[in-house]
């Protein structure tokens, strides 16, 4: 369950309750339907069904109307505790409920909820009665496929999604936001703006960057490398595959194998595509001996990794099988840890601001029940993370017990223009890999000690970050990131020589600029380039040619007439240099 959901929250209870109402409505309209599960989720609810005959979204309105009829009864939601034997009898015609019940302890009682003419296997909680739900405050939004228990080997069920709010005004506000999200979907804009494609026949989850998208990606990566070099990082390059002993030693084959691609056999050895970069960076560290005087090492890599994501989990470039991780590892001594964490936080905040993200949230994850390392290292590292966070104006919450077994961490989330949170940066202590790979350094007292290792990502994966940027800006990238920054449009052939002069002047200064001297009508050209979200159109008429000026039309339809050519160049280059948003 998303940690954004609080079971005691009234909206959570309403959404849980309306899911039961939906299941009853579906059963009334489609009597032979088998019912699976239906929880509340962030922004709404869903329920999974096995229909005898597949339904379409045309059926959603009928289901909504039946739901409103049920709500009018004002029926109560009543909890009852029963034995496993009773549950098996009640749900004997519901195979998915039976599958769940068989996993329960026979000695324990099972919780069910009754409402109107419906009984469901459920822990709750729910509202007291249906009068608490505004019948105008919900809507069924979509239909999707979902495997039972998320396993591709199981039956494909039909999942009906819905949303519910406290009142109709909140619902309308959410639906308007949802429409805007659809318009900005990175998969839709990726095709319209010719940024990337995914070819199922070649391989699901594998991203092809087209020239426009590749240009933006290159700009992001160039900026990343430049800033990392400025901030004391050394850039690494490591292979894409490694022998099985490496992944055995790291623990990936024990704990992460289901997310790895199958092994490849070559030269009497087994190789795996790398799911992470960490063991390769450690291999570089272990090529020599190190003194405390050498530390800290700050090693960063844009390393392509491969993870076997289930088909149903893939989502454009946001969730892919091959992607480039913005990875870094800081290897340091005990006394250096606090300064290094503070510096990573400062760096993360700076990087996000350059891409237009100034609203951040942080989550500090503490020690889980099962962990490696000693208590003193955990306590020290948690104090360091908390002290580092307290020095920045970033609100944070404690995620008690949410740390990985190998160390505590800070997760940084950004908030986009559609008010959605995205988990991006991670700062993670690791007490596991230094032990597994026997990483050491010679301390000041001459003894061999274990260094502290901090995993750190700022952008996450380049592909996912690119997808977030597309949706955040609706495809209208900032000037410095736009694949084409301006188009020159001469109004007729008589001014073409001057248009070429303007083109060469801007191009020679490094601008990504295009000259359109085709015979199409000017208004059609302007509409085309605004649709392509190109920041500037330079309109060259006879007056501009005579006075050596340009008139600028922006993608948002603003107009600046008669700007001196050199002044325009100076202003635009300044915006690009400063990475103005």
From Swiss-Prot:
Catalyzed chemical reaction(s): tRNA(Thr) + L-threonine + ATP = L-threonyl-tRNA(Thr) + AMP + diphosphate + H(+)
Residues annotated to bind Zn(2+): 278, 329, 455
Cofactor descriptive note: Binds 1 zinc ion per subunit.
A UniProt-annotated Pfam family: tRNA-synt_2b
InterPro entries found in the cross-reference section: aa-tRNA-synt_IIb, aa-tRNA-synth_II, aa-tRNA-synth_II/BPL/LPL, Anticodon-bd, Anticodon-bd_dom_sf, Thr-tRNA-ligase_IIa, Thr/Ala-tRNA-synth_IIc_edit, ThrRS_anticodon
Key words of the record: Aminoacyl-tRNA synthetase, ATP-binding, Cytoplasm, Ligase, Metal-binding, Nucleotide-binding, Protein biosynthesis, RNA-binding, tRNA-binding, Zinc
Cofactor: Zn(2+)
Cellular compartment(s): Cytoplasm
Ranges in a coiled coil: none
NCBIfam families membership: thrS (TIGR00418)
Function recorded in the entry: Catalyzes the attachment of threonine to tRNA(Thr) in a two-step reaction: L-threonine is first activated by ATP to form Thr-AMP and then transferred to the acceptor end of tRNA(Thr). Also edits incorrectly charged L-seryl-tRNA(Thr).
Family: Belongs to the class-II aminoacyl-tRNA synthetase family.
The protein's name: Threonine--tRNA ligase
Species this chain originates from: Borreliella afzelii (strain PKo)
């Amino acid at each position: 369950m998303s940690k954004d959901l609080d079971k005691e929250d009234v909206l959570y209870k309403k959404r849980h309750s309306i899911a039961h109402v939906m299941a009853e409505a579906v059963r009334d309209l489609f009597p032979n339907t088998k019912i699976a599960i239906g929880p509340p989720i962030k922004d709404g609810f869903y329920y999974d069904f096995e229909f005898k005959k597949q339904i379409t979204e045309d059926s959603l309105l009928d289901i909504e109307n039946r739901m409103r009829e049920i709500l009018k009864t004002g029926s109560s939601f009543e909890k009852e505790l029963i034995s496993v034997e009773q549950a098996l009898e009640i749900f004997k015609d519901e195979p998915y409920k039976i599958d769940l019940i068989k996993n329960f302890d026979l000695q324990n009682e099972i919780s069910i909820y009754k409402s109107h003419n419906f009984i469901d296997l459920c822990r709750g909680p729910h509202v007291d009665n249906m009068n608490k739900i505004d019948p105008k405050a919900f809507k069924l939004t979509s239909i999707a496929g979902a495997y039972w228990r998320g396993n591709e080997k199981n039956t494909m069920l039909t999942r009906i999604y819905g949303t519910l709010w406290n009142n109709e005004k909140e619902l309308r506000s959410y639906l308007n936001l949802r429409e805007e999200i659809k318009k900005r979907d990175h998969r839709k804009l990726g095709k319209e703006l010719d940024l990337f494609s995914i070819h199922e026949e070649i391989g699901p989850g594998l991203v092809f960057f087209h020239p426009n998208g590749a240009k933006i990606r290159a700009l992001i990566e160039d900026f990343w490398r430049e800033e990392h070099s400025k901030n004391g990082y050394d850039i690494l390059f490591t292979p894409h595959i490694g022998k099985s002993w490496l992944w055995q030693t790291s623990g990936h084959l024990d704990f992460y194998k289901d997310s790895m691609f199958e092994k490849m056999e070559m030269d009497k050895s087994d190789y795996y595509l790398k799911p992470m970069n960490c063991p390769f960076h450690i291999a570089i560290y272990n090529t020599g001996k190190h003194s405390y005087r050498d530390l800290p090492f700050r090693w960063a890599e844009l390393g392509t990794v491969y993870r076997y994501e289930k088909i149903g989990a893939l989502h454009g470039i946001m969730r892919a099988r091959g992607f480039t991780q913005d990875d870094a590892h800081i290897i340091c001594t005990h006394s250096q840890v606090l300064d290094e964490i503070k510096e990573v936080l400062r760096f993360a905040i700076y990087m996000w601001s350059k891409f237009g993200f100034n609203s951040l949230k942080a989550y500090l994850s503490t020690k889980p029940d099962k962990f490696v390392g000693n208590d003193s290292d955990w306590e020290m590292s948690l104090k360091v993370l908390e002290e580092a966070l307290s020095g920045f104006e970033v609100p944070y919450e404690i995620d008690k017990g949410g740390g990985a077994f190998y160390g505590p961490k800070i997760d940084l989330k950004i908030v986009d223009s559609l008010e959605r949170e995205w988990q991006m940066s991670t700062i993670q202590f690791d007490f596991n890999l230094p032990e597994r790979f026997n990483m050491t350094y010679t301390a000041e007292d001459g003894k061999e000690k274990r260094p502290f290792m901090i995993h750190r990502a700022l952008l996450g994966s380049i592909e996912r970050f690119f997808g977030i940027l597309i949706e955040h800006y609706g495809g209208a990238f900032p000037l410095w990131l736009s694949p084409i920054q301006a188009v020159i449009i001469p109004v007729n052939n008589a001014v073409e020589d001057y248009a070429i002069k303007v083109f060469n002047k801007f191009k020679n200064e490094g601008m990504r600029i295009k000259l359109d001297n085709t015979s199409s009508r000017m208004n059609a050209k302007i509409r085309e380039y605004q649709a392509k979200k190109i920041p500037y159109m330079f309109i060259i008429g006879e007056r501009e040619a005579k006075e050596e000026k340009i008139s600028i039309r922006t993608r948002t339809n603003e107009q600046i007439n008669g700007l001196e050519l050199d002044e325009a160049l100076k202003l635009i280059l300044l915006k690009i240099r400063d990475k103005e948003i």
